């Protein structure tokens, strides 16, 4: 099945943030490596840049938003789960044109692709709680329909 340009962007952002979390490389170094990555030519580059640079720039604020929905310290999560949660939280707060269910579904799929066997269940649960806090009107409308 062909991946959408937006899915490709999220996959590359996950890979870039994974690298950033492990190595603390600069966003410029990560950018340069991603440009040579498989699938870069098919990605929505504007979305990729917005996510990658936005998450790195707002890391502390995003962690602060995620933490109340976690059952353990964020540094105890796998780097893949952390990267995916950061991306989804960034999208929930900055890409309100994207329905929250799409963001959660994309995060679950990214975790299935790059993470451990059951990490996607945890990510789904955390993001359900987080979406209710960050987008209460949208989540309530969905639950009432």
From Swiss-Prot:
InterPro entries the UniProt entry points to: NusB-like_sf (IPR035926), NusB_fam (IPR011605), NusB_RsmB_TIM44 (IPR006027)
GO cellular component: a single term: cytosol
Molecular function, one GO term: RNA binding
Any one GO biological process: DNA-templated transcription termination
Keyword Mitochondrion: no
A Pfam family: NusB
SUPFAM superfamilies linked: NusB-like
Function: Involved in transcription antitermination. Required for transcription of ribosomal RNA (rRNA) genes. Binds specifically to the boxA antiterminator sequence of the ribosomal RNA (rrn) operons.
Family annotation (HAMAP family): NusB (MF_00073)
Protein name listed in UniProt: Transcription antitermination protein NusB
Species of the source: Burkholderia vietnamiensis (strain G4 / LMG 22486) (Burkholderia cepacia (strain R1808))
Lineage: Bacteria, Pseudomonadati, Pseudomonadota, Betaproteobacteria, Burkholderiales
